[in-house]
Amino acid sequence: LKGPLIWRWKDWIDRAFINRLNDLPKMVAPKVTGELATGVAEILAAKPLCGGCGAKVGRGVLSSALTKIAPPFDEVVTGAGDDAAVLRQSNGTFQVISTDHLRSLIDDPALMTRIAAVHALGDVWAMGAQPQVGLASIVVPQMSADLQARTLTEITQVATEVLSAAGAQLVGGHTTMGAELTIGFTVTGRKDTMPLTVSGAQPGDVLILTRPIGSGVILAADMEGHAHGRFVASVLAIMGQAQDREAAVLAPVAHAMTDVTGFGL
C-alpha cells in the first residue's frame, strides 16, 4: 500500500498515540514524615531551579555583597552594575569586559554553546563596543575520555564560530568536571569613545525591543513538561541569534542600551 492517504492515516495514528503521552495524570509527591531540618520542606516543594537568568542571585543579596568591594582604580570608569565594566586605556580609547555563564538548558552542547556565547557577547554589544577576545569557562559532567574530548571539541568549534562571526577570537579558557554541563565566556570589547551605559537613559526616551521577551516563561514551562515543542524550538532559535547588527544601528543614536537578561524585562 502506498499513497498520500496512507501517510495521512499513519500521521493520525501517530498523533493519537503522542496525545496519550501528553495527557498524563499528575503525580503526587509522598509526604515526608519524621523530624526534618529547617528549610527542607521548602526546598522539596520548590520549583526546579532555572539554568538561565532565573538562576541569578537576587538583586538585594548581590547589592549587599557588592557594597563590600573596594573602590575602583583610576582606569576603571564603571564597575559592577552595568552590562560590562569599562576601562580607560592609555591611548584614550576604552575597553569593556564582561563574564556570563549558563547551566545547560538542553542536551545539545553545540546549541548551548551558541546560546551562551551570544548571551555573553550581548553585554559587549549593549555597550556599543566591538567584541575583541573571549575566554571559555566550561564545566562538563563526568564521562568517558572519548566523550569528553568529543564534547569539548564540539563546544570549542561552535564558540570559535560565534566569536569569529562577531569579529572576536577565542584565546583560551578553563575546564573542570562537575555535576552538569555549564558553559560560560568572559569577553572583552573596545570602543574609541565612551561606551553606552544604562545611566545614560533620559526621561522621554523611546524603548525599543530588538527581540521578543518571555523566553524565561517558556523555558520554565519546559522544565515542568508543559511547553509545546514548537514554542521551545522557537525560543532556542531566537536565543542563538546574534544582536550585533541591531546594536550597530542603534549605538550611534541611543542614549543607553542594555542586554535584557536577569533583572530586565
Regions found by a protein language model. Give the residues of each.
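C-terminal, flexible cofactor-proximal segment of oxidoreductases
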Residues: 1-38
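Helix-biased detector of long, well-ordered alpha-helical tracts
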Residues: 37-265
